[in-house]
Amino acid sequence: KNIFNYYLDMKRKEKIGIIGAGIQGVCNALFLQKKGYEVTIFDKYEPGSSASYGNAGHFSPYASVPLNRPDVLSDVPSMLLSTRGPLALKWNYVYKMLPWFYSFVKNCRENKMMHTAKYMHQILDLSLPAFDELFEEINLDGLIEHKGIMYVWTNKSQKSRDLEINLRNNLGVKQRLLSPKEIHDLEPNLKPFYDGGVIYDYARHARNPKKI
């Protein structure tokens, strides 16, 4: 027992470096400090000023469905051709992207999607308790809203939404489907372009991610 405790003490004196001062880097650093490690974060910018700056600030333990999935493949051509699409490429860079694109397509198979979603869910299911543990040590007055998060869609994207809903149901994710009337009751100022929706009542969002 004494040898084991000595080993733990030695491990806790180790110095750990973390690259990136976004929300993930900072949270990892804080948990390591709580375990007794000496931690240094490396980033050429101020904490929270790169990927974590200007994001939606969602606390989303339900977000276990990966981007790599079968239904995405059929949407790629229209994404590339649309000037307003979410996917844009520099055509002179396509050749360099081929290895990445091949890996992306290979991981769009259903068995790969299920494998990724399973382990993402196991990790994300622990996220809210982990955040709560850290937040006990800081003043969060007015910085976090506990109002849930709602998604809406049209019939045009119903097939993809059904895939997401069914996958989350299989993983045991808590979700509540909404009719157009229920969406209107929750958000009467939202233009009624939608045909359905889902709400995650336990989800949260940050009013100012950088300040947190």
Regions inferred by a protein language model and the residue ranges of each:
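Short beta-strand/turn micro-motifs composed of small residues
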Residues: 20, 43, 153-154
